[in-house]
């Protein structure tokens, strides 16, 4: 058959029509648009936040789906089509310059999000994310509401948990510094409260701890550990003042295990997030030693009870321990102040 312009045009139209039918029309007719088991509708504030998210191109850096190969936050549940029921437009993103946000709801408190949107470096000094302060307070609140919606019913449970513990954390903070620290320590399991830091606070370990502190903790707890970092003005309760811990050691000698547990798990209800997905064990112990030495002026590193030292550890005597008489005087002063 001779190829003529007429045949070419008709053939092209038929191929195009077949493609559209197979890829658009038939799926649209046969596809069941049903919500997933965790889906919940957005309220007006959350819808406004979704529009802000889309209009400002947040999906250029963040995705909204969990894949079968994912291992990080939200990986407990793989994304399903019904999760995005009635989401218009359903822009899921393809890049992960920033973290996936499909299960962001309840991961952080509202005040953490406010500080983060005003300046992402306030909550993560290494963040590449631009500041969204220009949006204004109302739009930041709407965007925060949308963040807290992501995860749907699973997010609702996490948000409720944050709100429950926030009330208790604020009450403890208002009771005074020492009462606040006592309450915070009571939330740590006993075996952790009575556990010293098992690793020596060597010069190298403190240098590593300082680097971690500057990269993760600086803008909340401040350069001198007094809880007056740049983000503190947005947080209620504010970040902990480490310099008050020396008179609040567990059994007047332990602090390492408390640091480790609270850095690993965060303090739900406050802006203190968990770091168990970002920092492996040695880094948490190192930053614990750094905070203890530089801001508390004391570390329980390598005191009893202790096990066998790791093969790479150098011999090290703890120069930051107080003599028994000084420890006794500190305890008596604490009692007199109550």
Where do the PLM segments sit?
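Cytosolic-side transmembrane helix boundary signature
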Residues: 1-7
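Hydrophobic membrane-insertion alpha-helices, especially the h-region
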Residues: 9-25
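Flexible coil segments in periplasmic/lumen-exposed cytochrome c-class electron-transfer proteins
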Residues: 26-36, 63-96, 107-110, 119-215, ...
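Short extracytoplasmic
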Residues: 40-73
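Mid-length scaffold segments of soluble, non-membrane domains
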Residues: 97-104, 230-233
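Periodic glycine anchor positions in long extracellular repeat architectures
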Residues: 222-227, 266-269
